[in-house]
Amino acid sequence: MLDWLKVNLQYVTPKHLLSRLVGKLAEAEMGSVTTFFIKLFIKQYNVDMTEALHEKPEHYRSFNKFFTRTLKPEARTIDESDDVLIHAVDGTVSQFGDIRSDSIFQAKGHDFSLTTLLGGKPDVAAPFKNGKFATVYLAPRDYHRIHMPIEGTLTDMLYVPGELFSVNPLTAQNIPGLFARNERVVALFDTPVGKMAMVLVGATIVASIETVWAGTVTPPTGKTVQHWSYETDSEAAVKLEKGAELGRFKLGSTIVVCFEKDMIDFEDIAPGMVTRLGEPMASKMSSQKAITPEQTTETPVQASNEFDDNAGETKKDTPSEGADS
């Protein structure tokens, strides 16, 4: 009965209004009041602050600065093996596996449309049909920056307006098409394993989603899908190395990553498994592997310089290369 109530209350809650109000409070710099709420959050969710570059709650001028905190360089290491794709986030695997034509598995009894997930654009979805996907949930205690599973060059970004349902496991099991209904940002990359789509899914009280190349992408400016294309062969091209920061959530959410058919094989992962940034997620299929001998090395995770963690400011560039609304 309680679970039913938790799910169905979301249909009548003013989720966008609530999220924007919480977002404003999370950005506010309120001194000791901010510190009090950060300490309360750390205790409630058992956040491991020994991994944070700045361990003391008093360091963070706003709640969002705490929530998007930088980790110590040695806290995570990137598997640099040529044939390995890494986990992009700290989180929990919700689902993973094959994309069946245009259908992605969400939970028992629920699938959602690949095309709808990617903004309702068949040409964007086409490369990923019958490919692979992985959905990873970021809990409140997790590190909330998103990194690249493999090196890639940004080709397109879409902002897709939508609902802001919670994305926790209970909601995923009960709300049809959840990840294709919620507000989201889609980033498309050319990579050594073909096209890759990184979908950053918003949720209740997720005040905004940011990327390292465009700054804040949400809150939105309208109710239509917006599409930006990017140069790939000029000095202005956005090229990100494996393990480089891609973006961040201000309050937690979910990512869905999609790959083309016959390009990758998932490693030993399963629904419910806890993921750590930098650890192996998948490998290139045999036909995609380099002929040169494999070399396995590890390097510390480096946060992007696009964000100023001390000043409390983020890059304010607007998405470029021709918005298509």
From Swiss-Prot:
Provide the protein's localization: Cell membrane
Q: Catalytic positions?
A: 90, 147, 253
The cross-references to InterPro entries, in alphabetical order and at most eight, read: PS_Dcarbxylase, PSD-B, PSD_type1_pro
The membrane topology noted for this protein in its Swiss-Prot or TrEMBL record is: Peripheral membrane protein
Q: Which GO terms describe its molecular function?
A: phosphatidylserine decarboxylase activity
So which domain of life are we looking at?
Bacteria
Q: Which cofactor does it need?
A: pyruvate
Post-translational modification here is noted as: Is synthesized initially as an inactive proenzyme. Formation of the active enzyme involves a self-maturation process in which the active site pyruvoyl group is generated from an internal serine residue via an autocatalytic post-translational modification. Two non-identical subunits are generated from the proenzyme in this reaction, and the pyruvate is formed at the N-terminus of the alpha chain, which is derived from the carboxyl end of the proenzyme.
Q: How is the cofactor bound?
A: Binds 1 pyruvoyl group covalently per subunit.
Q: Which residues cross the membrane?
A: none
According to UniProt, this protein's pathway is: Phospholipid metabolism; phosphatidylethanolamine biosynthesis; phosphatidylethanolamine from CDP-diacylglycerol: step 2/2
According to the UniProt record, one GO cellular component term is: plasma membrane
Q: Where is this region: Disordered?
A: 281-325
Stored NCBIfam families:
PS_decarb (TIGR00163)
What protein is this chain from? Phosphatidylserine decarboxylase proenzyme
What would be the name of the gene that encodes this protein? psd
